[in-house]
Amino acid sequence: MKVVNLKQAILQAWKERWSDYQWAINMKKFFPKGATWDILNLADALLEQAMIGPSPNPLILSYLKYAISSQMVSYSSVLTAISKFDDFSRDLCVQALLDIMDMFCDRLSCHGKAEECIGLCRALLSALHWLLRCTAASAERLREGLEAGTPAAGEKQLAMCLQRLEKTLSSTKNRALLHIAKLEEASSWTAIEHSLLKLGEILANLSNPQLRSQAEQCGTLIRSIPTMLSVHAEQMHKTGFPTVHAVILLEGTMNLTGETQSLVEQLTMVKRMQHIPTPLFVLEIWKACFVGLIESPEGTEELKWTAFTFLKIPQVLVKLKKYSHGDKDFTEDVNCAFEFLLKLTPLLDKADQRCNCDCTNFLLQECGKQGLLSEASVNNLMAKRKADREHAPQQKSGENANIQPNIQLILRAEPTVTNILKTMDADHSKSPEGLLGVLGHMLSGKSLDLLLAAAAATGKLKSFARKFINLNEFTTYGSEESTKPASVRALLFDISFLMLCHVAQTYGSEVILSESRTGAEVPFFETWMQTCMPEEGKILNPDHPCFRPDSTKVESLVALLNNSSEMKLVQMKWHEACLSISAAILEILNAWENGVLAFESIQKITDNIKGKVCSLAVCAVAWLVAHVRMLGLDEREKSLQMIRQLAGPLFSENTLQFYNERVVIMNSILERMCADVLQQTATQIKFPSTGVDTMPYWNLLPPKRPIKEVLTDIFAKVLEKGWVDSRSIHIFDTLLHMGGVYWFCNNLIKELLKETRKEHTLRAVELLYSIFCLDMQQVTLVLLGHILPGLLTDSSKWHSLMDPPGTALAKLAVWCALSSYSSHKGQASTRQKKRHREDIEDYISLFPLDDVQPSKLMRLLSSNEDDANILSSPTDRSMSSSLSASQLHTVNMRDPLNRVLANLFLLISSILGSRTAGPHTQFVQWFMEECVDCLEQGGRGSVLQFMPFTTVSELVKVSAMSSPKVVLAITDLSLPLGRQVAAKAIAAL
């Protein structure tokens, strides 16, 4: 008999009562070649014929079961066919369909093209919706049956529905496929959510507790599908987190002026990467602050730490509160952190002793003001600490009882900063004497350092500096003035100049520099600071044009210094005097060296230079420092003698106000300026002492020891202690400056790879990450662009990648990559800008990624064309081995970090695809596992977007990576192509 269509063939089989295998053989004869059974809709046709009557046709159903078992039809076509049936009143038909689902719902798979795998996701979503509708209908019937007194039938069907639902949803693979389907078809997911709500309402009145709990479990599983990637277990067994500790110490010691937002982002990143519970995270921040306070050197550093702890950190926590979900929870976490902190009595007692007050009390008050703690919590915690303090060792001796604690002074200085900024906004020409009174008051004692620390911690230092630059600019020249206004103008110029120098030396010159505006005139102080002021790592040329002004001005200045009994003030152009002083000093030095001037004359000249306006002495020493560097050993004496004279006490009478206060600041500026050159020339100059070390972290390296030894030594000490202290941070920073990023990073990684104990390697990673925060961007480029590729491509080094150091290095690499990638669009911090930045062009030639000049690695990978058509979809771009989500998102490949990441993932892809296995393949697995562990989702904005799509199919061949969650995490599901790749990989698991 000639069969015309599928329906006829099925009917003939039924009439002639063919067995299932007979039916399959005959079907293949009727439809020999051409279209597949899915295209002919075989599953649909069989179900349609089987479900005609009130009960299903068992023979035709047996054909369908045979077709499923022998894979004549795909799972997706069967699920789609089932989900079309909607007459839930036909119990036997519904039960037959549930039985068919039971055959395969927990072992779905698809080994076809990507489109077929996406089809399976969609079919599963439809089937889930059908199951929910079916369950709701069964529950409704059960309710009606209970009312009529015949519950048994409805209960049996409801139990079957819930069983199939549970079986389908308990498979992680199925939930992953549904996750993809949800992104493909948002409207269908909305329908599922509605069905779930409806089902919940019906089941709420159900008396059977077993069925109700089963239904609730299914509901929970469905609701977990959209968030199945963001669940991470927190580390409850650890109590110390050295990375958080070190990041706080680093910021407090070296970056008080840094933006609060960038610190918040960095801390949030660490919290997420290390899965730290919030109370322990906040506790670690407070612990680090107290340690910083206790070990900070007396003077400016102590004030900086106080401002950081009591002004900046509460602001950081306020921002962290916005990041965390739920205000109430965060205040509870902060309260919990304080409860833990109060148990660290020795730490708090030591801090109280150092600060001469109850530190915790002040801290609690600040947190209360910022809304981080409720009033009740503040009072409760204060009472607990008060009770503890009664048993504390005796506070500082009686002589200190009248000294106000720094914390109180800093908290009082903060509103004063705002008032001073308002005062500085007024018209300077109207009441210069009043302004001078305010500034004079700022110079007394430690007022200036207090105000600067408060301004730095609250982000106001830049506007503070800007106001002083404007004042300095305003006072450079005054016309037709009498003696009184001239002396006020000289004082305002001098005080603003000294303050700005002090700010630049204490907080970095970046605070002073304005945003570059085209066409705008650069203020005098900025020009002088950039071209003439000595700083760490800045070499000045004493013959630079900036030191060689108009010769007539120089001659008149030399005459003025040499002949007058004191400096004239009226109509003096102070900026010109400051720029001419260097050339004048050169003339005077030459005259002295040639015997034209005697030492007494030099003494009179230096007294004239510093007698009225200390700024001139600062400018003179700035040039002398540059000049001394260029002289031979036997030529330096007179220049150094002149620096001594300028830094020494004044021999004549001074006549201008606030002289002693100005000299104190001048001497601290001169001491910092001369530090480098005095060390290089092995000279000593005694600067008048203020009783406080003005440069506590300077010259920390031991003399005559190779820097590699110093690096390994200090790292070993830090590792043994388990945390980084402020002094070590400064030593690491000096070594980074001295040895360069590659040397620094390479040697520390060698130290990490020497570790053989697991707990040591993990501690080393936490500490290294925080040390690398000194210049995370550059370190990451070196680590991912040079060191890792070197280890992965050289078989003689593979042994060093064994576990545990290999696992640790993978963790460190991922942490660095994530931190740099999340922050590299932001601003480089003050301390990082000082370093030489590596040219972008270096990275473009090292890692070419354009079509014109493909790198060796790109060519090597592109030649592997076996996988080229893995996703032969006409709608998507052709699939080359290197195509990644970043290319579809058109990420800027001129950026060095993007290039390095893209190349690293190409290398990973080639290692996974190669036939040689070893520690390097194991390392790649650890690297990817860590990526998955740290990431919320491998979408746009994540480092995994640089991974070629073809890597996914290679990765799932590695046993540890062959899980649906891993596939979802490493693919960019925001892209259709990403979803296809994920569906194909998961469906094949």
From Swiss-Prot:
Q: Which InterPro entries match?
A: Mediator_Med24
Q: Where is this motif: LXXLL motif 1?
A: 128-132
Extract one GO molecular function annotation from the record.
transcription coregulator activity
- Name of the protein: Mediator of RNA polymerase II transcription subunit 24
Domain of life per record? Eukaryota
Sequence motif LXXLL motif 4, residues = 557-561
- Residue ranges of the motif LXXLL motif 6: 857-861
Motif: LXXLL motif 2; annotated at 344-348
Found, by tissue, as follows: Ubiquitous. Abundant in skeletal muscle, heart and placenta.
Q: What is its main location?
A: nucleus
Q: Which UniProt keywords apply?
A: Activator, Nucleus, Phosphoprotein, Repeat, Transcription, Transcription regulation
